[in-house]
């Protein structure tokens, strides 16, 4: 019997992405401490948090197949997460203006019953346009990207902030790498293309 698919996230963006695959799924709030550890790299951080989210989800769904995802950006060698407010969003976008920024998304798929864990990091690179302070403020006020790593929504007006995007899956930038997820699901016997 196929275990129930659970998204360990309350993100409406991740839920909307997962719905694209046409699979029935539930969701839960993983409620974990997302603080980085001392000297932890961005890749290690998102991998650890994605795994932790699946394990937290498994406490609610002990027979589930749990999906966990986490994302950060790196600007000038510093890990950047969600801005949480207008001031921080403007600061993040000002720092990113004219630069090439890499986003790292950790994706984990955990079979709670068997203990099998598959976790990987998917990078995605963004080339920001040179942005004026007025453009940044106008964007932040229009889209209020306070709960998005890097302070933008690439699926919306945020696309106007960029010169170029580089990566295997544009969904990665929104927070859930669907190409990688479909590969992981296939390894669990779930083919999203099957009848």
Swiss-Prot record:
GO terms for cellular component: cytoplasm. It catalyses: N(7)-methyl-GTP + H2O = N(7)-methyl-GMP + diphosphate + H(+). GO terms for molecular function: nucleoside triphosphate diphosphatase activity. The record marks 13, 71, 155 as: Important for substrate specificity. Gene3D superfamilies: 3.90.950.10. The active site is at residue 70. This is 7-methyl-GTP pyrophosphatase. The keyword Glycosyltransferase does not apply. It is found in: Cytoplasm. GO terms for biological process: nucleotide metabolic process.
């Amino acid at each position: 019997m196929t275990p129930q698919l659970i998204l360990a996230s309350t993100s409406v963006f991740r839920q909307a992405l997962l719905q694209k695959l046409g699979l029935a799924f539930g969701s839960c709030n993983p409620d974990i401490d997302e603080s980085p550890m001392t000297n932890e790299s961005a890749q290690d951080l998102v991998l650890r948090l994605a795994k932790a989210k699946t394990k937290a989800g498994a406490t609610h769904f002990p027979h589930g197949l749990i999906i966990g995802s986490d994302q950060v950006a790196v600007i000038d060698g510093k890990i950047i997460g969600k801005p949480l407010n207008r001031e921080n969003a403007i600061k993040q976008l000002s720092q990113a203006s004219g630069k090439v920024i890499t986003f790292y998304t950790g994706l984990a798929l955990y079979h709670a019953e068997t203990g099998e864990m598959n976790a990987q990091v998917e990078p995605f690179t963004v080339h920001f346009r040179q942005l004026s302070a007025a453009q940044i403020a106008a964007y932040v006020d229009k889209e209020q990207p306070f709960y998005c790593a890097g302070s933008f929504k690439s699926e919306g007006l945020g696309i106007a902030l960029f010169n170029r995007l580089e990566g295997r899956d544009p969904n990665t930038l929104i927070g859930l790498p669907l190409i990688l997820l479909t590969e992981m699901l296939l390894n669990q016997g779930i083919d999203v293309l099957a009848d």
